[in-house]
A protein has these predicted regions:
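Soluble periplasmic/extracytoplasmic beta-strand elements of cell-envelope proteins
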Residues: 97-99, 124-128, 170-172
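N-terminal low-complexity, Pro/Thr-rich disordered segments
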Residues: 26-69, 197
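Peptidoglycan-targeting cell-wall enzymes and recognition modules
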Residues: 55, 59-67, 105-163
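Catalytic and binding regions of secreted/periplasmic enzymes and modules that target cell-wall glycans
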Residues: 139, 144-197
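Export/targeting segments at the very N-terminus of extracytoplasmic proteins
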Residues: 56-102, 106, 194
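Hydrophobic alpha-helical membrane-insertion segments, chiefly the h-region
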Residues: 19-27
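Surface-exposed patches in mature extracellular/periplasmic domains of secreted proteins
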Residues: 87-98, 109-114, 158-168
Length: 197
């Protein structure tokens, strides 16, 4: 074998190795790598807060009641809020609607309860087909029932400036007109929680 070719090959390979080492840098670091442990600010786009003064403009009246809600009841809260928005009404209308439904059905979409039922009242608002609220299918549809209630509420002059129980009673014509007031705080809390969700 030609020694000149062998020498050129060895020198070429050595040259490549040196050049590669310079270009690639050292393969072994003598310093331990560090991790930046400084706190990082996380910015979350929060939903706009609901104006609490708008929810209960007159303050709550009387002792307040509260119940724990299951998933179905929470779904009905969200349906009432969605229908309120669809009707072009504000958070206060949602508070009145939810408090009314809390009193009438505990936010349960009730069917006919037989002997325990108040006449033919059904749905979230215990509306009656015989009183012109709609068919059984309509009044047991949360969106329809809420829109029907809100249609009645819109017809009450100055409802926004009334105590909740008076506004609800004017629409519902209940035998227990003062019972709506006990649900105002929970209704306001639910609207504050779900209005922007």
């Amino acid at each position: 074998m030609n020694t000149t070719i062998l020498r050129k090959s060895v020198l070429g390979i050595a040259g490549l190795a040196v050049a590669g080492g310079i270009a690639a840098g050292p393969l072994h670091l003598t310093d331990t790598p560090t991790v930046d442990t400084r706190p990082v600010a996380v910015v979350q786009a929060d939903k706009p807060a609901v104006d609490k003064a708008k929810l209960i403009p007159h303050g709550v009246q009387g002792e307040q009641s509260r119940i724990d809600l299951n998933d179905e009841q929470t779904g009905n809260v969200k349906a009432i809020i969605a229908a309120t928005k669809k009707a072009g009404m504000d958070e206060r209308a949602a508070v009145v609607s939810i408090a009314t439904s809390l009193q009438e059905s505990k936010l349960e979409n009730l069917g006919h309860l037989g002997d325990r039922n108040d006449h033919d009242s059904q749905g979230l608002f215990q509306q009656r087909p015989s009183s012109g609220w709609g068919t059984v299918e309509q009044i047991t549809d949360p969106e329809y029932a809420t829109l029907a209630f809100l249609k009645g509420l819109k017809q009450v002059d100055g409802w926004q400036d009334m105590p909740l129980t008076r506004a609800a009673q004017t629409v519902q014509v209940s035998a227990y007109p003062d019972h709506y007031a006990q649900w105002e705080q929970q209704a306001a809390d639910l609207v504050a929680e779900h209005w922007n969700s």
